């Protein structure tokens, strides 16, 4: 990625085995759903890190208070909004880039959280008001202590927001997050390592330093072909030295408070049969 390297080590239960996915037979286990949420958060974070900067925008799109919104209307509204927004960007010779998720409040009110590249916020607000009659608030993207976009927390928040609709029978989208097709993915390299190369305290490489706050040694969920079970995992981030040397004091914005994204309290009993 632009400013760092994200390392993810895990044990592969399929190594050296011919294991194929069996057809779905029953509801997806909770552990597997959690794993899929975590994987979606990682992919979403990679796209944010590679395509957005601190000057880009975090939008919150809402509907008028106490106005119930059906999923079909929400889908049509957001599609129409993106079509108008794409046209507005094109007039300024800018290519629209976006990532968004749909959520619901405890009272069932639909809202969207969206990342877009830098643009006139007055135009964006007027377009959404014209389509939905609702409001729009915005901030610049949240930064971390090193002064670059805090893509991990933003991605976690987006996936947490999508859980409010994705696990309902009347879900708005069939995806955990929606993104424009022009987003670039970082280069992903896979390699086999020996057990002795798995250090509890990982070492850095030339030109990078290990972010001590990012080190995680624990367990993740592994599909061994028969059932989902725990496996040993390690995650950490390598920060480019140039970022650390050039960082300045920046005003830090914090995300709204929310429960731990993958805690036991965040799971809804109302799930569709096709999950």
Regions found by a protein language model. Give the residues of each.
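Right-hand nucleic-acid polymerase module
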Residues: 1-108, 118-275
